[in-house]
Amino acid sequence: MASGARELSTMEADIQMMCAAEVHLGTKNCDFQMERYVFKRRNDGIYIINLGKTWEKLMLAARVIVSIENPQDIIVQSARPYGQRAVLKFAQYTGAHAIAGRHTPGTFTNQLQTSFSEPRLLILTDPRTDHQPIKEAALGNIPTIAFCDTDSPMRYVDIGIPANNKGKHSIGCLFWLLARMVLQMRGVISQGHKWEVMVDLFFYREPEETKDQEEEDLPVGDYVADYAAAPIGGADQWNAIPDAQWGGDVVQPANSAVPAGTWTDAGPIAGDGWDAAAAPPVPGAVGLDVPAPTGWE
């Protein structure tokens, strides 16, 4: 009885989390194979998904994942940008192989490709966006698990989990719940105990937010200590050079001493002010042959 109450409380907590992440919000269109999972339709035309059936399908998918011995035989793939971070985190904690981004055609069918693989299970985010791997998995008899919205095609999907596969919070919440259920069934996490990994790690983050977070996490350096450090090349290094490294030819200083007898008078010095111009030098007397007076003047 206690285990049933604990399971019921866990289910209620998971459903509340899915409601907060808007997992229950579908689209205005509904595929005929998804009508069994629809709870009701709002006045604005949006279909509401029954989260009780979503939780049951998550448990079924977790049992299928645990039944595979080697986790590397499981491929988790998402071409939708909102699901790429969640796919990588899911693969990190469960040991599966993640493919985040565009699917290379022929990965499951062309044996000549270097990226060829034959997985035992394929987990996808959106059957409409990931239509190529679904078709290749059908050709290779690979079972497929996919998160299906109300308008998603169910062809070639073996286990369809009804949920909102277009919101970044919804996709992260679904992969977090699936990873926690897998770890609980493997015995890594005890039943009824809280998983220490937060669901926020599975959410999509904008590149600008990631860059700002990395800049905030950088430690602030002590620049004052760097300036107070010893100078490059201390004073002892200048005297440490031996004299043998210098050349043998020593340049003698020029003899600049001039005897006092050879000094000459310098020219006139300029005025005290900067704007005062120096007086031109007076020319010396020039010897001219002047005739002697004759008395007629």
UniProtKB/Swiss-Prot annotation:
Keywords: Cytoplasm, Ribonucleoprotein, Ribosomal protein. InterPro entries: Ribosomal_uS2, Ribosomal_uS2_CS, Ribosomal_uS2_euk, Ribosomal_uS2_euk/arc, Ribosomal_uS2_flav_dom_sf. GO terms for cellular component: cytosolic small ribosomal subunit. One of its GO terms (biological process) is translation. GO terms for molecular function: structural constituent of ribosome. It is found in: Cytoplasm. It comes from the Eukaryota. Pfam families: Ribosomal_S2. Coiled coil: none annotated. Its main location: cytoplasm. Belongs to the universal ribosomal protein uS2 family. Required for the assembly and/or stability of the 40S ribosomal subunit. Required for the processing of the 20S rRNA-precursor to mature 18S rRNA in a late step of the maturation of 40S ribosomal subunits. Component of the small ribosomal subunit. Mature ribosomes consist of a small (40S) and a large (60S) subunit. The 40S subunit contains about 33 different proteins and 1 molecule of RNA (18S). The 60S subunit contains about 49 different proteins and 3 molecules of RNA (25S, 5.8S and 5S). Interacts with ribosomal protein S21. This is Small ribosomal subunit protein uS2. It comes from Daucus carota (Wild carrot). The lineage of its organism: Eukaryota, Viridiplantae, Streptophyta, Embryophyta, Tracheophyta. The gene is 179B.
